């Protein structure tokens, strides 16, 4: 499964969510599918997308928050899983695209390439709903179930280590920040 295909498949559902995405390939691919003012591309903060998403979910419990993370990113901040589990926001869906590599910074293998299991780590940390999917149909079904579950979910999507030609977004970082803040204030 390609990460961009997974994002395209659920893109219509993201219109009604607050979306935080980690840097690099994930951010660039989501923007290439189509930018929306409810999307925040967290650049230069590897490992912190789940933390930012948690803060938004706790501050705005009436909003559905989706975090797009990567295996390299979440492995840099495993404490983020325990913090998610501690607070258990019912409005947060944490999607981890696991390509078993640090694709955006050179393609070096991550620990998941040798057997580490992010969904099992999330479950052991106390995240109430976890799943690992390996194909597009299973991803879409699991994502839809997570959106409707009203329970903190970490969904690990195993994807190919293929990304865009460039790992940057066209939207200036400050403009994204201000646009996203205006969006949240308007709700």
PLM features: residue spans?
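Conserved thiamine diphosphate
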Residues: 109-144
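Glycine-rich beta-alpha junction loops
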Residues: 23-26, 99-101, 158-163
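Active-site-proximal loop->helix
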Residues: 78-87, 93, 104-121
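Thiamine diphosphate
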Residues: 29-98
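Short acidic, glycine/serine/threonine-rich loops at helix termini
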Residues: 30-33, 105-109, 166-170
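Glycine/aspartate-rich loop-and-adjacent alpha/beta segment that forms the canonical ThDP
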Residues: 3-4, 36, 149-187
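Active-site diphosphate/adenylate-binding microenvironment
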Residues: 1-46
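General beta-strand structural signal in soluble alpha/beta enzymes
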Residues: 18-23, 41-42, 67, 131-133, ...
């Amino acid at each position: 499964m390609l990460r961009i295909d997974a994002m395209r498949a659920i893109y219509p559902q993201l219109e009604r969510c607050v979306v935080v995405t980690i840097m690099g390939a994930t951010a660039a691919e989501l923007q290439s599918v189509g930018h929306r003012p409810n999307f925040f591309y967290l650049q230069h903060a590897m490992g912190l997308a789940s933390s930012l998403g948690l803060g938004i979910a706790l501050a705005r419990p009436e909003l559905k928050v989706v975090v797009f993370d990567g295996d390299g990113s979440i492995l840099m901040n495993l404490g983020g899983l325990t913090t998610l589990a501690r607070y258990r926001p019912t409005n947060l869906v944490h999607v981890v695209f696991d390509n078993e590599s640090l694709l955006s910074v050179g393609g070096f293998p991550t620990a998941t390439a040798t057997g580490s299991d992010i969904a099992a780590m999330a479950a052991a940390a106390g995240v109430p709903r976890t799943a690992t999917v390996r194909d597009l149909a299973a991803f879409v079904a699991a994502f839809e179930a997570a959106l409707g579950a009203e329970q903190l979910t970490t969904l690990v999507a195993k994807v190919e280590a293929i990304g865009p030609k460039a790992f940057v977004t066209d939207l200036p970082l400050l403009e994204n920040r201000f646009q996203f803040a205006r969006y949240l204030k308007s709700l």
